[in-house]
A protein has these predicted regions:
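A structural motif corresponding to the C-terminal end of an alpha-helix
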Residues: 1-11, 84-92, 121-126, 227-237
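Structured mid-domain segments that build the active-site/substrate or prosthetic-cofactor binding neighborhood
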Residues: 70-178, 182
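Repeat-unit-sized solenoid/scaffold elements
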Residues: 30-64, 93, 97, 117-136, ...
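Catalytic domains of carbohydrate-active enzymes that cleave complex glycans
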Residues: 125, 152-300
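Gly/Pro-rich turn-and-neighbor structural signature
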Residues: 1-86, 96
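Weak global preference for isoleucine
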Residues: 7, 11, 41, 57, ...
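Surface-exposed beta-strand edges and their flanking turn/coil or helix-capping segments
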Residues: 28-30, 65-68, 107-109, 144, ...
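Detector for methionine-enriched segments
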Residues: 2, 53, 82, 93-94, ...
Length: 300
């Protein structure tokens, strides 16, 4: 049909390897993965070819997906499945996740491992990487930094993730950068405390306990707010001619903390304080279309 109609392009049909379709149709022969038979090998030539979009929704997003560094048993199995798929397809793709669907307005900590994971994907010959984030609100914590770090690693997996984080903050927040670094560092330290409290580091994309009050105490929320208030102040007294831009970027993070305070700890406030907080939160929710705390599905 394509030849008859002068269509000169290559079309890729993509198989979605998701849930029960995640397992690759392979067997081990002398320690190597091979297809169980020729019929399961995705078509690699011609104008219509077949790729595989591997989608490990069950993964732990605290640890790397890799066979080269220490990881959890769940992700070690996922790494083996990726290698198995890579053995039978030339067009391996990845559908990953960058948010907790039960906690849209909370930090999602897959920062420490993302470099190791992307280096492993590169070793597997990955052709395409997609990461689903919080699309139902217009913002989520450090979402711009998340996009920056991942795009840089996609171009060059040898980059150090912490160096990219520092580079982003220094350029994105201007005179407020050092205080934002303190804020982000305190968030990461809190995750270590959360892992100790929960007795596990296995946090998936539906880990609802991350939102409880024990994970984000009132004193911690106020401490995090203070770092961003300091960042805003330093921008005000700085010499940049882009103060409004930097202040807006800080406010996005600040609003999310205020939203957390409003939902969890507004009972500590007197009426005047409560009214002021509510005005800020309602303004932020409208400005950023940030009304949802959890995923809204077609079923409600």
């Amino acid at each position: 049909y394509m030849d008859a109609n002068g269509i000169n392009k290559t079309i890729y049909l993509v198989a979605f390897a998701y849930y029960s379709y995640r397992q690759p149709p392979v067997k081990l022969v002398n320690g190597e993965y091979v297809a169980v038979d020729e019929s399961v090998i995705p078509k690699k030539d011609g104008k219509v070819r077949v790729g595989v979009m591997y989608t490990p929704i069950e993964a732990c997003y605290t640890h790397p997906i890799s066979d080269e560094v220490e990881t959890c048993d769940k992700n070690a199995q996922i790494a083996e499945e990726m290698k198995a798929w890579a053995s039978i397809t030339d067009y391996l793709m990845m559908y990953s996740y960058g948010t907790n669907f039960q906690a849209y307005k909370y930090h999602f900590n897959n920062w420490s491992h993302i470099g190791d994971s992307i280096r492993f994907y590169e070793k597997c010959g990955l052709k395409y990487y997609f990461e689903q984030a919080c699309a139902q609100n217009d913002i989520s914590p450090m979402s711009s930094m998340r996009a920056y770090v991942r795009s840089k690693l996609a171009w060059n997996s040898a980059y150090n993730t912490q160096d990219l984080i520092d580079e982003f903050i220094e350029h994105y927040y201007g005179d407020g950068a050092e205080s934002v670094k303190q804020y982000f560092g305190a968030v990461m330290e809190n995750f270590e405390r959360i892992y100790t409290i929960d007795g596990t580091e296995d946090h998936n994309i539906y880990y609802s306990k991350i939102t409880n009050n024990e994970s984000w105490t009132r004193s911690l929320v106020k401490e995090l707010q203070s770092y961003l208030e300091k960042a805003d102040y330093k921008i005000d007294i700085g010499s940049s001619n882009r103060k409004d831009v930097y202040k807006e970027r800080v406010f996005r993070e600040y609003f999310l903390l205020k939203d957390c305070e409003y939902m969890k700890y507004s009972g500590y406030l007197n009426q005047e304080e409560y009214d002021e907080l509510e005005r800020l939160v309602m303004y932020g929710r409208e400005k950023y279309n940030a009304y949802l705390s959890t995923e809204k599905t077609n079923n409600g």
